[in-house]
Curated annotation (Swiss-Prot):
GO CC terms of this entry: DNA-directed RNA polymerase complex; mitochondrion; nucleus; plastid
GO BP annotations listed: DNA-templated transcription; megagametogenesis
Zinc finger (C4-type): 1104-1125
UniProt-listed PANTHER family: DNA-DIRECTED RNA POLYMERASE I SUBUNIT 2
UniProt entry keywords in alphabetical sequence: DNA-directed RNA polymerase, Metal-binding, Nucleotidyltransferase, Nucleus, Transcription, Transferase, Zinc, Zinc-finger
Reactions catalysed: RNA(n) + a ribonucleoside 5'-triphosphate = RNA(n+1) + diphosphate
Manganese recorded as keyword: no
Record flagged with keyword Transport: no
Matches recorded under CDD domains: RNA_pol_B_RPB2
Name of the molecule in the record: DNA-directed RNA polymerase III subunit 2
Length: 1161
């Protein structure tokens, strides 16, 4: 059926078609946000710790036990023990005869370690020399493994909110930490240079070197090839000194100089660079493999404690097992190693000719992050091997004694002390944080830290913290600066100030850290895709210009003539789910290499795949996600989203928004759009958890965001739903925490809106009284009365009731209700312990305890009253402050001692000098508290809670704070939470200022957020419009009550006789160098004399006028004597600070003699 001419005209008519609609993207990108919470369900934040630990429990521990599965006696080789299977059980504790399951909350309260037994099934030979018999035992416990909370072996794994509440656990608590002896410990993420990769660098003298840190299951070694004075040498710790590299190549069987030159490259510049090294080799008289091996043999370090000499010579075995240890040597065929050295030499000479070819050690692609699973795996392997060697020693010891050998049972030797060694080793390392693994010469300190529970967000930030392997003392800017490669992987804001600035980093919101993938299938896949094996290549063919080397995890597999096709094929396979989702493929045009990586510890993040700039994720996919029929893993499986690591990002062109490039229709933008390979899921995910709390951070000056990251961790609020059941040493809680009126997407994702740490305060920005200079805040007394900024401080006190070896024990007595101590005991209950709910004052007794006088002598009968002495414990607190006994808990520790824990509660209202801060790094102390009657008020009768000085804005440039005030004001007036996510205006995750202003005008306020205020003192209108509205303020943990301190006289230090330091020791306040300079400038000489000597450490000395040295006063002769002149004729007495006298004597001990010249005053 044909159309009429008229209809045809209509269809051809341009007005009929909405061209804009056709050219617009399928649907705006604002809807992709839903992917972020879906991603956080399966990956990211704390999940990397859990994934890593789960990998160790499910895979790593089996590999370790399998690798060391059989141990044989050295005395009788037919006696052996074999491990068949290993598994980690449920967390439990062994009471006298029963096994009791435990949960994390119990462990926190009772100071236990949250650990599970490690079971093994064993097969072994037992019996005497004559009749040996095979036997098998199942479920033998070899030790206890501390369990990470929320991991696959944890009680909390997979539980819903109701079940978690039943176990006394907070559903918002992220897990990812261990409980060791009742304290929560986090194994920090460790940052390291990647293993098995060639890194080209230069030393201080400018010598170029190529280094490879090889790491295999068996050995870890570092190989350095360095160029010195145009000659190239190898440095390896087993050789005495540097060794010419050509000799090493000849020792590995590459005898022909021509082949060596071909292998590095035919370019004349390359051969010219190698010439001095080849000449040196000839001058040493080394031409054949045998001569080279003999030369190396002489250079091997002699090891005093002896491994027996290998049959094929030590030099060859070092080259095989330690030199580039990760490159395999099948049947003593060193060809692969030679080629590897060739590639290293080529890269070095390229770097020498062109400095751009050097590697950057701070580039994130050259870094690996070590997570808890890997660290515990190293530790467990070390302890397991120690246990096996101990078992063999025990067996040999028994077999050498014929009487005991007849009743011999191998499995008994395993149980003897071994299970304690593994349990204790793991517990001690996690408790102290000191990793000492002797086999790999690994000694690191501070690997674990106590999880600080100051605020909910503080503990979240703590778990995503990355600890550097770099000395903080070195003042280098390189590793500290913000690298472009950190985009999207590490948070650009969240780093501490001070010495560790830029070294300690935090993960961004959508970063994932990879775990290990199997290499075997990948290798096979590469060969199937047309990689030519190294074995069949000649040295000449290694660097043909049109083909690239293929390197998998630092191993050279071979060459490929169509590298781009190879890389794209691997990517297609990855998107189809045929190879692991975290495998990365990266072509490096400069180095003519294709790198394939599947190793552990790379940082990667998910991105939406785009075809010619158009996103693969369409509206219907997001609809399915919202309906719950599609998960994040489905997006990956269907090839809509993929994970890219830092190296592969270099091959991609990533757009922030799908519409990028379409706004300007010039040719450049169109071309860029056509080349776009990926689109960001959400731009605000480049920030971490802590920086995500800041509203409108992209409107603030950068260091302000960094300051807020540090202060947000110190803000008081709620720490968890179970906070009132916890027994923490110190707990700060806000009485009325609120949700921020101006919120961000991150706040909702993390759960900060449920456990906030601050309050929405109505702030007027104006000068008021003189008490608001330098960021101080003027506070409204009525607001404080209504509970603004009020907080609770809870402290734990522990008392022990001990049992002693001589069958005696402490006893707790009924308190005296009359008598001299009755007043101090009035808070005690009839059981001799403080009653919950009682008000406790300083010097009150909280436990009426008595201790046996003699705890050594054995007693058979009960002790009489006279054999006990009182050991009451008194409460120490700030004078004049009353506190409340909140809870009393009784529990027993490992040794069965009774442990009594008290929680003391103290409610504090804000006072002068307490520290507050907004979410924009603007901290200030309370300068004065003023009655509400004197405060200014608006025409609606609104009175501000705080008054802030306007001078805080110009130099700080925190425009985000101004927008927050407007947004919160609009939110209050229209009853909707407004959003201020980073970079969110374009995607709808941040309200624009225009729309906020429009809302304000609609609700009857000024569009600029300013109000007409009346003075509370005179009642007249204030002569300027005042910027007023709600801002979210945080109360920080720094409070005057904890810091305020002064003293008259008090304790002194023995050595210098000066007052001690610090509030806890009742110390003095030091007049330091700057204060001294200030007093000198004033010319207040008597004050200097009084402060620095009379009130500090005056000391009377006898000085000899003849020699100027110190003498002493002889009390027998009743006169002063000079030790040097041996008489007392010419001695004067004077006052010196004791520290000065000490300095003189210390100098004299170093042969420096200070002499005092005296004149009459």
């Amino acid at each position: 059926m044909g159309l009429d001419q008229e209809d045809l005209d209509l269809t051809n008519d341009d007005h009929f078609i909405d061209k804009e609609k056709l050219s617009a993207p399928i649907k705006s990108t604002a809807d992709k946000f839903q992917l972020v919470p879906e991603f956080l369900k399966v990956r990211g934040l704390v999940k990397q710790h859990l994934d890593s630990f789960n990998y160790f429990i499910n895979v790593g521990i089996h590999k370790i036990v399998k690798a060391n599965s059989r141990i044989t006696s050295t005395v009788d080789p037919s006696i052996y023990l074999r491990f068949k299977k290993v598994r980690v059980g449920e967390p439990s504790i062994i009471n006298v005869n029963t096994v009791e399951n435990i949960n994390p909350h119990m462990c926190r309260l009772a100071d236990m370690t949250y650990a599970a037994p490690i079971f093994v099934n064993i097969e072994y030979v037992h019996g005497s020399h004559g009749n040996k018999a095979k036997s098998a035992k199942d479920n033998v416990i070899i030790g206890r493994m501390p369990i990470m909370l929320r991991s696959c072996r944890c009680v909390l794994h997979g539980k819903d909110e109701e079940e978690l509440a039943r176990l006394g656990e907070c559903p918002l608590d992220p897990g990812g930490y261990f409980i060791i002896k009742g304290t929560e410990k986090v194994l920090l993420i460790q940052e390291q240079l990647s293993k098995n990769r060639i890194i080209i660098d230069s030393d201080k003298k400018g010598n170029i070197n190529a280094s490879v840190t090889s790491s295999t299951e068996m050995t870890k070694s570092k190989t350095v090839i360095q160029m010195e004075k145009e000659k190239i040498y190898l440095f390896l710790h087993r050789f005495v000194k540097k060794i010419p590299i050509i000799i090493v190549l000849k020792a590995m069987g590459m005898e022909s100089d021509q082949e060596i030159v071909q292998m590095v490259g035919r370019d004349p510049r390359f051969s010219a660079s190698l010439l001095p090294s080849i000449e040196e080799c000839v001058s040493e008289g080394v031409n054949t493999q045998k001569q080279a091996l003999d030369y190396l043999e002489a250079k091997v370090k002699k090891i005093s404690y002896g491994t027996p000499p290998e049959k094929d010579g030590r030099a060859l075995s070092i080259l095989r097992d330690l030199f580039l240890a990760h490159v395999p040597v099948p049947d003593n065929n060193f060809r692969q190693k030679c080629f590897y050295v060739g590639v290293m030499l080529r890269r070095m000479i390229e770097a020498m000719l062109n400095k751009d070819a050097m590697d950057d050690k701070d580039y994130v692609g050259n870094k690996r992050l070590e997570l808890s699973g890997q660290l515990i795996s190293l530790l467990f392997e070390d302890l397991f091997k120690t246990m096996l060697s101990e078992a063999i020693k025990n067996v040999d010891h028994i077999l050498n004694k014929p009487i005991r050998a007849s009743r011999f049972d191998f499995s008994q030797c395993l149980n003897k002390d071994s299970r304690y060694s593994i349990s204790l080793g793991l517990e001690r390392t996690l408790s102290t944080g000191n990793f000492d693994i002797k086999r790999f010469r690994m000694h690191r300190k501070g690997m674990t830290q106590v999880l600080t529970r100051l605020s909910f967000i503080g503990s979240m930030g703590f778990i995503t913290k990355i600890s550097p392997q770099f000395e903080k003392s070195r003042k280098v800017s390189g590793p500290r600066s913000l690298q472009p490669s950190q985009w999207g992987m590490l948070c650009p804001c969240d780093t501490p100030e001070g010495e560790s600035c830029g070294l300690v980093k935090n993960l961004a919101l959508m970063t994932h850290v990879t775990t290990d993938e199997e290499e075997g299938p990948l290798v096979a896949m590469c060969y199937k895709l047309g990689v030519t094996d190294l074995e069949v290549l000649s040295a000449e063919e290694l660097h043909t210009p049109d083909s690239f080397l293929v390197i998998l995890n630092g191993l050279i597999l071979g060459k490929h003539s169509r590298p781009q096709y190879f890389a794209n094929s691997l990517r297609r396979l990855r998107r189809a789910g045929k190879i692991g989702e975290f495998v990365s493929v990266f072509t490096n045009e400069k180095q003519h290499c294709v790198y394939v990586a599947s190793d552990v510890g790379r940082v990667c993040r998910p991105l939406v795949i785009a075809d010619k700039g158009i996103s693969r994720v369409k509206q219907h996919h997001m609809k399915e996600l919202q309906d719950g029929v599609r998960t994040f893993d489905d997006f990956i499986r269907d090839g809509l989203i993929e994970y890219l690591d830092v190296n592969e990002e270099n091959n991609a062109l990533i757009a922030l928004y799908e519409s990028d490039g379409t706004t300007e229709l010039d040719e450049g933008a169109e071309a860029a759009k056509a080349d776009t390979t990926h689109i960001e899921i959400e731009p605000f995910t480049i920030l971490g958890v802590v920086a995500g709390l800041i509203p409108y951070p992209h409107h603030n000056q950068s260091p302000r965001n960094t300051y807020q990251c540090a202060m947000g961790k110190q803000a008081m609020g709620n720490i968890a739903y179970n906070q009132l059941n916890r027994m923490d040493t110190l707990l700060y809680l806000l009485v009325y925490p609120q949700r921020p009126l101006l919120t961000t997407r991150t706040i909702e994702l993390v759960g900060y809106d449920k456990l906030g740490a601050g309050q929405n305060a109505t702030v007027a920005v104006m000068s008021f009284s003189g008490y608001d200079i330098e960021d101080a805040i003027v506070m409204n007394k009525s607001s404080l009365d209504r509970g603004f900024g009020r907080c609770i401080v809870m402290k734990k006190i522990v008392a022990m009731s001990q049992k002693y070896d001589n069958c005696t024990a402490d006893r707790i007595l009924i308190p005296q209700r009359t008598g001299p101590d009755a007043e101090k005991m009035q808070i005690l209950d009839d059981d001799g312990l403080a009653t919950p709910g009682e008000i406790i004052r300083p010097n009150d007794i909280y436990i009426n305890k008595q201790v046996p006088v003699d705890t050594v002598t054995k007693f058979t009968s009960a002790l009489s009253d006279s054999q006990y002495r009182p050991a009451r414990e008194y409460f120490k607190g700030p004078e004049g402050e009353t506190q409340v006994v909140d809870r009393v808990a009784l529990c027993s520790d490992k040794k069965g001692q009774l442990c009594i824990k008290y929680i003391i509660r103290h409610t504090r209202r804000p006072e002068l000098g307490d520290k507050f801060s907004s979410r924009h790094g603007q901290k200030g102390v309370c300068g004065i508290i003023i009655q509400q009657e004197d405060f200014p008020f608006s025409e609606l009768g609104i009175c501000p809670d705080l008054i802030m000085n306007p001078h805080g804005f110009p130099s700080r440039m925190t425009v985000g704070k101004m927008i927050e005030l407007l947004g919160s004001k609009a939110g209050v007036s229209c009853g909707r939470f407004h959003y201020g996510s980073a970079f969110g205006e374009r995607s709808g995750h941040a309200d624009k200022v225009e729309t906020i202003s429009a809302t304000l005008v609609e609700k009857g306020f000024s569009y600029s957020g300013k109000d007409l205020l009346y003075s509370g003192i005179s009642g007249e209108p204030v002569e300027a419009y005042i910027f007023m509205g709600p801002i979210y303020y945080q109360k920080l943990k720094h409070m005057v009550l904890d810091k305020m301190h002064a003293r008259g006289s008090g304790p002194r230090v023995m050595m210098t006789r000066q007052p001690t330091e610090g509030k806890s020791k009742n110390g003095g306040l030091r007049v330091g160098e700057m204060e001294r300079d200030c007093l000198i400038a004033y010319g207040a000489s008597m004050l200097i004399y009084e402060r620095l000597m009379i009130s500090s450490d005056p000391f009377e000395v006898q000085v000899c006028r003849a020699c100027g040295l110190l003498g002493y006063y002889n009390y027998k002769l009743k006169k002063a004597v000079c030790t040097t002149c041996k008489n007392g004729d010419n001695i004067a007495t004077m006052k010196l600070p004791y520290a000065c006298k000490l300095l003189f004597q210390e100098l004299q001990s170093m042969n420096v003699v200070p002499r005092l010249k005296l004149t009459e005053a």
